[in-house]
Amino acid sequence: MRTVLALMNRNRKLFFKDKGMLFTSMITPVILIVLYATFLAKVFRDSFTAAIPDMITISDKLINGTVAAQLTASLMAVSCITVTFCVNLTMVQDKANGTRKDFNVSPVSSGKIYLGYFLSTVANSLMVNALAFVLCLGYLLKMGWYLNAVDVLWVLFDMILLVLFGSTLSSIISFPLTTQGQLSAVGTIVSAGYGFICGAYMPISNFGSGLQKALSYLPSTYATSLIKNHMLHGVFMEMERKNYPDEMVEAIRDTLDCNPVFHGNVVGVNQMIGIMMGSIAVFGIIYYFVTLLPDGEGGR
């Protein structure tokens, strides 16, 4: 275990030493929250107000708080996954510059080497996304704060789950890559497409029934819904406190993807947590077996 920790610390130091990669990873959440607030806030607001009956009046603070919670939840859902591809660059760099050849003739097993890559990816991703979370809390405080301490802790738990999910996924995808250009191309594709697939850019409830059914098989759907449920929990509690009709509140929950459906059944929060834990375990097992395969420059 001491060897694994030493490898993890070595990878983390390389991440901090590469100022370009560090700056890119740290600035990504800032850019995302600016883009989300600029281009998606109005879309989210229109989607939310469309579910409110004309005879019911909701304060601007509650509307802004709802939109901000949805926006920040979407940002965190995307950031926790895409950032892992940025910080996982060390695995590919070691193959590109020949460092893996030195590791391969050392007494350290390939399993420990790849576990070190994985743990450093998790640690660095948590650090970057912690910054994103602080920015999100500041945005919520400005727009409309309805979270309590328990909600914040649940969101932190969600963030850890999503980072673990993203780290296993990025480790599997990055394993066969041997150049930084390949990883950059993969990162670009993931950054561009993941937000649509997981329902961050546009609620899945706005898609056609066929696409909704297809996306219900992906764990990313439940990852986004999970963090939305905890981010919006205080908002829904405020609506109940003000005695808004239950039908309206449920319609809003459906519109915001807080009630994902699988084969006609609504998936609950505990089930979403189970899906994410199961996905992490499955991808972790796949990563383990993948690392046993020869990979050219990096194989043993």
Place the predicted regions along the sequence by residue.
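Aromatic- and glycine-rich beta-strand/loop motifs that create alpha-glucan
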Residues: 1-32, 97, 112, 297-299
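Short amphipathic alpha-helical coupling elements at transmembrane boundaries
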Residues: 6, 10-14, 97, 101-105, ...
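Hydrophobic alpha-helical transmembrane segments of multi-pass membrane transport/permease proteins
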Residues: 14-48, 67-85, 126-129, 187-195, ...
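Hydrophobic alpha-helical transmembrane segments of multi-pass membrane transport proteins
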Residues: 31, 64-142
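Perimembrane loop-to-helix junctions flanking transmembrane segments
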Residues: 47-63
